[in-house]
């Protein structure tokens, strides 16, 4: 008799995706982040659901409802901080996942890569709207500043911003719609993640060497299921250390002050995971130019496959490209630091140089160095 997991219509899908899936025998821990992102998403949906049971999306009561969750709801504080810090874990995994893709040439699977970019943008939108919900000072002013960027769009900008706000400023209507979108988007992310996997399983996983591994596959279960569980436990450990020992480490103290449209905080800045993009935005003195640079800083990922000039897929055997990659990582860390600093000398200049370097590495240096490596190898 055939095993039920191979015949049952539903079990068959799970079997072919997580059990009998042929996987490369040499994928490293860098391949763990896909499953970790799945775990993050599930944690965020569950904690978010329980928070939504007690949260009110009204400007007069939103801040108090979050306080009520932390003080009066059974284990509300841990649910709230798991959700807030879970977002940080989500972005850590996202950045490492994208970094892995850049390093090992995973972008050579165009459908998987492009859906990944859409996922990244959707998660960023979700996180931004979630940050507005507690209705603290940074929530309100963050929402005001970021939505205002759309007014840089010629001709329709102002109308567009007022349409998104649902009025002439960030107010009750804005908060309500942001809550609605923040609730629905994770389920859209879930669907996109399923499509992401669907396309990945059409080609099979890449591996560190970048060489096709069809001649050497192993079953996903038990080898990679146990590896993924270990990764998930380590991530859960890190998350709970953050939640239980320093839950506000990554947050902004200004968000413990209720939103006040009449008083602007001295330094408006987003959560840490947006700082690199915020630094690029601020480094251009023109509003529209800054918005375009901000957009392009993420959308540049979509043209990475077109800029691949190397004869090899992975950077495993390309030391010069590796130097460029780690220079890019260092540059992103500098941008993240600059995004959290006030707009004054010397931070302005550092931010501008780091922004120029970011685009130069991706658009010019990496493709050029790949060609040099091809020539050195006489390929």
Swiss-Prot record:
Heme b b562 binds at residues 83, 182. A ubiquinone binds at residue 201. GO terms for biological process: mitochondrial electron transport, ubiquinol to cytochrome c. Keywords: Electron transport, Heme, Iron, Membrane, Metal-binding, Mitochondrion, Mitochondrion inner membrane, Respiratory chain, Transmembrane, Transmembrane helix, Transport, Ubiquinone. The chain crosses the membrane at residues 33-53, 77-98, 113-133, 178-198, 226-246, 288-308, 320-340, 347-367. The cytochrome bc1 complex contains 11 subunits: 3 respiratory subunits (MT-CYB, CYC1 and UQCRFS1), 2 core proteins (UQCRC1 and UQCRC2) and 6 low-molecular weight proteins (UQCRH/QCR6, UQCRB/QCR7, UQCRQ/QCR8, UQCR10/QCR9, UQCR11/QCR10 and a cleavage product of UQCRFS1). This cytochrome bc1 complex then forms a dimer. This is Cytochrome b. The lineage of its organism: Eukaryota, Metazoa, Chordata, Craniata, Vertebrata. The gene is MT-CYB.
């Amino acid at each position: 008799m055939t095993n039920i997991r191979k015949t049952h219509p539903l079990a068959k899908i799970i079997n072919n995706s997580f059990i009998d899936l042929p996987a490369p025998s040499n994928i490293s821990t860098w391949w763990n982040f896909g499953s970790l992102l799945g775990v993050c998403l599930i944690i965020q949906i569950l904690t978010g659901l329980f928070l939504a049971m007690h949260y009110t999306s009204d400007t007069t009561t939103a801040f108090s409802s979050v306080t009520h969750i932390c003080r009066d709801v059974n284990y509300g504080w841990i649910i709230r901080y798991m959700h807030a810090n879970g977002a940080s874990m989500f972005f850590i995994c996202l950045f490492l996942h994208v970094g892995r893709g850049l390093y090992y040439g995973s972008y050579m699977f165009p459908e998987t890569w492009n859906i990944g970019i859409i996922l990244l943008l959707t998660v960023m939108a979700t996180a931004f709207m979630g940050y507005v919900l507690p209705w603290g000072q940074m929530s309100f002013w963050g929402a005001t500043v970021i939505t205002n960027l759309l007014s840089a769009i010629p001709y329709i900008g102002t109308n567009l911003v007022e349409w998104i706000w649902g009025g002439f400023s960030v107010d009750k209507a804005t908060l309500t719609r942001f809550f609605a979108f923040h609730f629905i988007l994770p389920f859209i992310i879930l669907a996109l993640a399923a499509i992401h996997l669907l396309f990945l399983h059409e080609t099979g996983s890449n591996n560190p060497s970048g060489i096709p591994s069809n001649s050497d596959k192993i079953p996903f279960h038990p080898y990679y299921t146990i590896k993924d569980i270990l990764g998930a436990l380590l991530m859960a450990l890190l998350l709970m250390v953050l939640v239980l020992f320093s839950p506000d480490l990554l947050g902004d103290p200004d968000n413990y002050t209720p939103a006040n449209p009449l008083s602007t905080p001295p330094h408006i800045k987003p959560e840490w995971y947006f700082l690199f993009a915020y630094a690029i935005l601020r480094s251009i003195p023109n509003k529209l130019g800054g918005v375009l640079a901000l957009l392009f800083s993420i959308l540049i990922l979509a043209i990475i496959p077109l800029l691949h000039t190397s004869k090899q897929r992975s950077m495993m055997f390309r030391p010069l490209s590796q130097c460029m990659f780690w220079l890019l990582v260092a540059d992103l860390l500098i941008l993240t630091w600059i995004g959290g600093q006030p707009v004054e000398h010397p931070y302005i200049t550092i931010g501008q140089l780091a922004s120029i370097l970011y685009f130069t590495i991706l658009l010019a240096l990496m493709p050029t160095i790949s060609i040099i490596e091809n020539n050195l190898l006489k390929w």
